[in-house]
């Protein structure tokens, strides 16, 4: 299988697949990918790809950022090792990524728009382990710095360090400002040697200056001396830093122990994330190459529809249609060299390998492929499709091996069968080999330019001819496969087109016997008939597509009409509601005035006031009642009840609010401004909006908001790791309330800068991005404005 993968360029296809993984976890899975020979397993692999493809169609992406292969860290912690701060934050980031993708899939399951049982099975085994994530993030920031808040002792000792450093700098500043001292210094700066603060003193003042010499310049003209006035403070600072180091080690040891306690579940989480990354990569790749899920069988039947080779440029590849299997067990593709026969052969083989690997195939719907136990290919000398053919002996050695290993559940691909030797003998061998393969029950597709094999399919049961179309006018192959029609050499037509004397061509025709001439004429007639039938089919297909387009357009117009009708009714009702409200306001004013008159002794009967109010109040509830019926109808159509966080409209108040919680079978608590009130379900209208993510999805990182910096330094990072950090950093910056942040990537080769620009350009929460100004780092810094 390894040899046929190389011949059919399976590994090149895997390189394309690698472009769609989100992490090194998915990359490892792709590198391990091999075709399966079990129909049941292949169907499962195809089903998981289909689930991920449906998720992409519904949501557009799967959030897999921030995850990385932390298995070595986990295993080291499990045997008692102490992890570094960077390793621990990578574990926390992977936990966060796992929690996010778990919530993402669970939300899809709750919505019920699509079924994802395989993906659900994977995320079900992922445990968020929030206590570990929270513990790490409370102690370490995203840059791997252990925070002061990690412990009381660390906060205290760092306060001491800052105090000592401040005292040292103050004394050194006094010395550098002193006119007596300044003349002794090579430069009025403070520097550090051997973790001690020192001043650069000229060699000639060594005895005068006093203090401890820690270093000297390469020329010897400058000595780096620790002044006697700060020796004690420097000693205290050194001791404090040693305490800080011990405390950090203690914190890292405790966090590593927490990781060790959950090492088994952590490893399972990572394995499931690797599987999810791989499955989603297959779906992303299918979308990129416009691939479909094939129907599968185990009876050796292939039905390729508009099949395309995935390694060829989409604008140049010509789709092919062909069916082989069941009654037809051998397909012989004839025609001249450079006609595209080898491309067709490789397309059949590679698409079969892709399907057996659980990948969708670049073809049209209803494509069907078989799952074979063995796939063999004798194609050239294992060269790319542009290279020349191998020798006869090389071909024959490979063919002998194939014939010895094949069985009835095998697919065999022969390129230029019988080539490289005497044409008569080569053709005879080719016919005999094809007969042998047919008797063994295997499926064979062979290409040849020998005219002797053109009649093979007409004389053999279970065999079919095919050819690759050649345009005599342009002298170029069209690469279109014509099934049922053997290929022609077109030698006379091509020679005439190139200007060969007609007398020479006529003389050459006399050298061909009448039977051969009749065969060529028959082939030409078949080819013309095939083209005519194909043309008619294309016209019929165009009419069908036009009819479907008209049907879709009509449905769209009907839907638009219904929306316009509904909008007009709603507008009329709103207008009526305003009229009633205005009338009610005026009536209330009149009733108030009547009461004033009543108090003044004017005869106004109370029952008249009550009746007037009653008539006014009866008008508005009718509108509200009608509105409630509409809302109920819309709710039934939407098939979704309000949920906490949903924005709604309370009809009786005509006010927008937010659902807090459900407090009864048909009653919800709604936040209206500063008020919370109970509202019945038929008084609530769900507003059109993107559904909010539950608050619990972000609460675990609140403790880290205070430590998010206004800039992210990516210098020295690998591209893949850098992109994960950018995605995570933008999420944290938004949660921390930043409106503008900077991402430092350096100038270097420009790869990081380009990657950052491409990422933020597609981020929904990024308003704009620009290069830093002269005082902002220039092209080495990208300044991002957040929405």
Curated annotation (Swiss-Prot):
Source organism of this protein record: Shouchella clausii (strain KSM-K16)
Assembly with partners or alone: Homodimer. Binds to stalled ribosomes, contacting rRNA.
PROSITE patterns: DNA_MISMATCH_REPAIR_2 (PS00486), SMR (PS50828)
Entry's family note: Belongs to the DNA mismatch repair MutS family. MutS2 subfamily.
Function: Endonuclease that is involved in the suppression of homologous recombination and thus may have a key role in the control of bacterial genetic diversity.
Gene: mutS2
Enzyme class: hydrolase
GO biological process entries: mismatch repair; negative regulation of DNA recombination; rescue of stalled ribosome
EC number: 3.1.-.-, 3.6.4.-
Domain Smr intervals: 712-787
Protein name: Endonuclease MutS2
Disulfide linkage: none
GO molecular function: ATP binding; ATP hydrolysis activity; ATP-dependent DNA damage sensor activity; endonuclease activity; mismatched DNA binding; ribosomal large subunit binding; rRNA binding
The keyword ATP-binding is annotated on this UniProt entry: yes
Annotated residues for binding of ATP: 335-342
Protein keywords: ATP-binding, DNA-binding, Endonuclease, Hydrolase, Nuclease, Nucleotide-binding, RNA-binding, rRNA-binding
Stored Pfam families: MSSS, MutS_V, Smr
């Amino acid at each position: 299988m390894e040899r046929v993968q190389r011949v059919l360029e399976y590994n090149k296809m895997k390189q394309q697949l690698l472009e769609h993984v989100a992490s090194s976890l998915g990359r490892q899975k792709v590198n391990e990918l091999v075709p399966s020979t079990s129909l049941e397993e292949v169907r499962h692999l195809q089903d998981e790809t289909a689930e991920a493809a449906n998720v992409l169609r519904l949501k557009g992406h799967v959030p897999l950022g921030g995850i990385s292969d932390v298995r070595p860290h986990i295993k080291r912690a499990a045997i008692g090792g102490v992890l570094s701060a960077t390793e621990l934050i990578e574990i926390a980031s992977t936990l966060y990524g796992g929690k996010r993708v778990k919530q993402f899939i669970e939300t899809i399951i709750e919505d019920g728009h699509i079924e994802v049982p395989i993906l659900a099975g994977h995320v079900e085994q992922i445990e968020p382990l929030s206590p570990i994530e929270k513990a790490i993030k409370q102690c370490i920031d995203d840059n791997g710095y252990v925070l002061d808040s990690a412990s009381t002792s660390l906060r205290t000792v760092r306060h001491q360090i800052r105090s000592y450093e401040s005292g040292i700098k103050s004394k050194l500043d006094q010395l550098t400002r002193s006119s007596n001292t300044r003349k002794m210094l090579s430069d009025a700066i403070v520097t550090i040697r051997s973790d001690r603060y020192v001043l650069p003193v000229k060699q000639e003042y060594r005895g005068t200056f006093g203090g401890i010499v820690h270093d000297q310049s390469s020329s010897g003209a400058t000595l780096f001396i620790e002044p006697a006035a700060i020796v004690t403070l420097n000693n205290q600072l050194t001791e404090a830093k040693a305490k800080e180091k011990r405390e950090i080690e203690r914190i890292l040891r405790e966090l590593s122990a927490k990781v060790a306690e959950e090492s088994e579940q952590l490893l399972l989480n990572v394995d499931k994330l690797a599987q999810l990354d791989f499955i989603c990569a297959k779906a992303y790749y299918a979308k990129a190459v416009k691939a479909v899920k094939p129907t599968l069988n185990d009876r050796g039947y292939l039905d390729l529809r508009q099949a395309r080779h995935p390694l060829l440029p989409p604008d140049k590849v010509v789709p092919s249609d062909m069916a082989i299997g069941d009654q037809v067990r051998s397909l012989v593709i004839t025609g001249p060299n450079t006609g595209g026969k080898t491309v067709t052969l490789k397309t059949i083989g590679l698409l079969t390998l892709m399907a057996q690997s659980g990948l969708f195939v670049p073809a049209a719907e209803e494509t069907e492929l078989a799952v074979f136990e063995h796939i063999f290919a004798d194609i050239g000398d294992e060269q790319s499709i542009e290279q020349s053919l191998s020798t006869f002996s090389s071909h024959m050695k490979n063919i002998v091996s194939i014939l010895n290993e094949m069985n009835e559940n095998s697919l065999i691909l022969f390129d230029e069968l019988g080539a490289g030797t005497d044409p008569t003998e080569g053709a005879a061998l080719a016919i005999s080999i094809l007969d042998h393969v047919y008797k063994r029950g295997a499926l064979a597709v062979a290409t040849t330019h020998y005219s002797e094999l053109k009649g093979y399919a007409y004389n053999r049961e279970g065999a079919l001819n095919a050819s690759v179309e050649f345009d005599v006018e342009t002298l170029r192959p069209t690469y279109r496969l014509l099934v049922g029609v053997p290929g022609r050499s077109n030698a006379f037509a091509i020679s005439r087109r190139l200007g060969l004397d007609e007398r020479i061509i006529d003389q050459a025709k006399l050298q061909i016997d009448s039977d051969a001439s009749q065969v060529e004429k028959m082939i030409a007639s078949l080819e013309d008939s095939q083209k005519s039938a194909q043309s008619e089919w294309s016209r019929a297909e165009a009419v069908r597509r036009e009819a479907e387009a008209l049907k879709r357009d009509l449905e769209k117009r009907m839907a638009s009409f219904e929306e316009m009708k509904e909008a007009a009714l709603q507008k009329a009702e709103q207008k009526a509601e305003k009229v009633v409200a205005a009338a009610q306001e005026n009536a209330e004013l009149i009733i108030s005035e009547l009461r004033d008159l009543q108090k003044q002794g004017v005869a106004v009967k109370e029952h008249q006031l009550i009746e007037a109010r009653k008539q006014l109040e009866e008008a508005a509830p009718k509108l509200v009642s009608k509105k409630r019926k509409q809302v109920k109808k819309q709710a039934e159509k939407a098939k979704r009840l309000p949920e906490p966080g949903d924005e709604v409209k309370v009809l009786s108040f005509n006010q927008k609010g937010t659902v807090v919680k459900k407090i009864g079978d048909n009653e919800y608590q709604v936040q209206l401004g500063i008020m919370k009130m109970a509202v019945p379900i038929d008084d609530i209208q769900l507003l059109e909006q993107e559904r909010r993510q539950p608050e619990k999805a972000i609460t675990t990182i609140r403790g880290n908001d205070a430590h998010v910096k206004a800039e992210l330094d990516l210098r020295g990072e690998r591209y893949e790791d850098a992109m994960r950090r950018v995605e995570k950093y933008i999420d944290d910056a938004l949660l921390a309330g930043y409106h503008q942040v900077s991402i430092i990537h350096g100038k270097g080769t420009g790869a990081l800068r380009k990657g950052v620009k491409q990422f933020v350009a597609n981020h929904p929460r990024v308003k704009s991005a620009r290069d830093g100004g002269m005082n902002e780092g220039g092209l080495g810094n990208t300044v991002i404005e957040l929405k």
